[in-house]
Amino acid sequence: RDRLRSRGLGDVYKRQDLPNSKLTFFSAGSYELFEKQAPNVQKEIKKEFTIIEEPNDKAIKKSKKLGYLPTKSKTASVNENRGDFLPSTTQMAIDYLSSRSTNGFFLMVEGARIDKSAHSNDYSAVVREVLDFDKAVEAAIRFAEKDGNTLVIISADHETGALALRDGNIKEGKMKAMFVSKGHTPIMVPLFAYGPQSKLFGGVQENSDVSNKILQLLAK
């Protein structure tokens, strides 16, 4: 997998990182953002990728490389009725990549709006985004269980908001919590791994060590 050098999808489009990358599947941003790019940029991307706005079995089957760019409504917050975009797209990516590779594949899935919701100190959105991300994790674990040779790693690059759980009532099903910050914090984040070589990811680790270990495993 090539590393795309920017977090901004618009910048990725402008530099034409996508056509020159080794990516087989991507889904990000929205089709509206794609349409705002210069015609020559759109043309170059479409030369390499089949671009779809909605899941299309016929187009997916015919494609050699796929870009799924849904409408803005599907990438909004779960509080804005996004639906099951993240878990369903995770399943789409797993199905697409596993059917086209005899030597395995690397897939990264990000629940980006967990961070955004924490920056806003929005309790409800954080909880709902985490539960939505958990469904994407479930899709990955189910595939790994069936495949038997897939490693799944779940973590975060940082904590946001310093969310503290203060008190709760099991009978009422309620929990009191408070945010201490609206920014990133040095609080440690969980690291979970399931599958072959998962023991490499136990204990307390520097996050840069996680990526180095992934690269070492991919090189084997």
Regions found by a protein language model. Name each.
Residues 2-13:
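Single conserved hydrophobic/aromatic residue that forms the stacking wall/gate
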Residues 131-170:
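Metal-dependent active-site segment of extracytoplasmic phospho-/sulfohydrolases and closely related
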Residues 24-29, 67-70, 105-110, 115, ...:
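Structural recognition of the beta-strand scaffold that forms the well-ordered cores
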Residues 21-25, 47-50, 64-66, 99-106, ...:
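Loop/turn elements at helix/coil->beta-strand transitions in domains of secreted/extracellular proteins
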Residues 26-75:
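Long, well-ordered, tryptophan-enriched scaffold segments
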Residues 180-207, 211:
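Substrate-binding rim/cap in mid-to-C-terminal beta-strand-loop elements of soluble/periplasmic
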Residues 72-77, 90-94, 101-104, 108-136:
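Active-site His/acidic residue clusters
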Residues 1, 31-35, 58, 73-76, ...:
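Solvent-exposed loop/turn segments at secondary-structure junctions
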